[in-house]
Amino acid sequence: MPKYYCEYCDIYLTHSSPVGRRQHNQGRKHISAKIEYFQNLLREEGITPQNFLGFLGNQGYNNALANPMMNNFMPGNYNAYMKYNPMRNYHHSNRNPNYQHSIGMHNNKYSRAGYVPPGSNKYPNNHFHNNKRINNIQKPYNNFDNKNNNYNNKPITNSSYKNDKQDYRNNNENNDNMNSNHFSNYQMNKENANFVNKNNE
């Protein structure tokens, strides 16, 4: 099997297997050599990032956004090393909130990809990654949705559900006192009944 020759890096690969080729193509040196090759090619044609879209026209503008190699030459976009960047999965072509796809947009002074007009927000607010709730509405404690909505937004204050052991113990002591009072009242009523019965005899 013949060795694989990389035209961008001008080398023969020692490992010519598909896995070796893939590893080479994803390597840093190969990517930088590929970028340098296309930059030299564009420079020879007299194409710069500033006039790049003017050479291509409307169709070329859309193709340039779809082609990652061409997208790297546009100002404001990340280069090919963005695979080492933690924000590599972020869609960079829509960074500008005023960005629009329209015919004839290459004639607009704000049409360059990644260009931010003065006074606009370069990075729009991202509500999904904020720790705040969007509408800042507090949840009720115990929302009981009924026509007679008497329980809405009232905090729970039942002492028997508190985790405080002292309160629980006090409640039990109160219950014991109540039980003993009931018992003594029962005894007194029983004795009074016996006393009445003895007098009747």
From Swiss-Prot:
Oligomer and partners: U1 snRNP is composed of the 7 core Sm proteins B/B', D1, D2, D3, E, F and G that assemble in a heptameric protein ring on the Sm site of the small nuclear RNA to form the core snRNP, and at least 3 U1 snRNP-specific proteins U1-70K, U1-A and U1-C. U1-C interacts with U1 snRNA and the 5' splice-site region of the pre-mRNA.
Any GO molecular function: mRNA binding
Protein's recorded name: U1 small nuclear ribonucleoprotein C
Low complexity composition-biased segments: 137-154
Domain of life: Eukaryota
Range of residues in the leader sequence: none
GO BP term (any one): mRNA 5'-splice site recognition
Keyword Ribosomal protein: no
UniProt zinc finger (Matrin-type) residues: 4-36
Keywords, alphabetical: Metal-binding, Nucleus, Ribonucleoprotein, RNA-binding, Zinc, Zinc-finger
Cysteine disulfide links: none
Compartment annotation: Nucleus
